Amino acid sequence: MPDWKLQSSNEVMLLEAYGDSPAFDALLKATGRGARRDSPVDQDCIDAKNSVDNNDLEILHAPPGYAFFPSFFSLSRQFPTDGLTFISPCYMGLHNNVSTPEMKLRAHDWPPQTPDFVTHDVLATYIQDTAAAYDVLSNISFRTRVDKAEKKGSKWEVQSSRLVDGEIETAVQQFDALIVASGHYHAPNIPDYPNLPAWKSAFPSRITHSKVYRSPTPFAGKNVLVIGAGVSSTDICRELGSVAAKIWQSSRGGEYDLLPSMLPENCTRVGGIASFSTLTSTSLLHNTAPIPGSVILSSGEELKNIHHVILATGYHMSYPFLPHLHDDNATPEHANEEILVTTGQITHNLHKDIFYIPDPSLAFIGVPYHVATFSLFEFQAMCVAAILSGSSSLPGQQEMRKEYVERIAKKGVGRAFHSLKDDEGEIAYVREMVGIVNQGKKEGEKVEGHSKEWFEAYGRRLVRMKEKRGRKVEVEVKEKVAGPAEAVQNEGVK
């Protein structure tokens, strides 16, 4: 097994943030690195614009959250042609639903009296204050996009472009290792329903993905079809309930669908979608006019007088800066031993959902889901640091491959592959991370895993998840604490 110890030169850390905390903003100004305009829920901006020029340099190099308008969307599985039309899946009413005690970083405490469930700006402030406290800012390149990354010889060659005073500056840099921490929620899943592309083409602002949803205000008095019945869909339906005239929520009866009892009174749970009808007109619609077509359900029922369709159909894996490791023509079952992405359901060929088996100098943070994100990703980062610094080591490639193949045989190559939702799944995974970090460490130097406070909060999470999905509660905890109603969204996903 090669030694993947990093040299001191060219070490880099990139962070992605969603709005500046006071401490972070102060550092930006003090270092002259410029302010960022990336609030994902700037309502004034939402109300002022209905379309954006995708070729505008400010948009092409904007952080996630700045560019989020429905006109950006293409109804294909591919990224937009500019490659950088990033849209942040964050809306005004978003709360965490995995509690703050579970997400607490070992490196930084939450402010005193922080509730278990908070708004997204509190979460952003916590991450940014952590970065400010540890001088992460000096290692961040803002308004920069990675265009391509490729291993050449013993180094990773990274091509990037940066917007400076309205002009694009390009750069090519070499690194000993590449760590990808770009997350799950950027490449929307678009279902292949007959005539859906025609509806989107004719009325682009009426057919959107949940990723661009920001607030219920634009849907006041309208009839809305929300496709999908998972956590994001249910959260959106609950918000729409106070303003929309009529809501339908389409469900295929999936494993992660929430209970219909959680929906507002003006929302009806219906079955899966069979097709979208042929449009009777493609003329410009008045704001109050419904779409001139209908949606046919699998049962044969027909939904009419629909003003808006929201596709709450999730996301798929995509790493557009690693095109040589994508094979969009292959099925997951036929992925070879080098490819990372096929249909986007999973990221292939990773050891422990982190290390690229053919070349562990490529590592990923944040691939597992149904977890307490911040804390689990911190354990992953500690594991990566231990391997790349040489203080710990990985098994040989043959052993890593054997473990990966056995895992596929057990879990399959569907979306459940990266899920740690099963009882003890997340706990066992963190134990593995800690085991790797502690290789060769003496007593007194070893890193500990989850804290007592984490386990108590985790027990409460299991209760909430099983109650919301109508399952028998098998886990007993002394204290049962439920989050606010808003905390239902994305339960166990983020």
Description of each model-found segment:
Residues 2-129, 153, 351-354, 400-425, ...:
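Glycine-rich active-site loop/strand segments that organize a redox cofactor
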Residues 111, 119-123, 132, 136-139, ...:
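Glycine-rich dinucleotide-binding loop and its adjacent helix/turn
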Residues 143-147, 161-163, 211-214, 272-274, ...:
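Conserved SAM/SAH-binding loop
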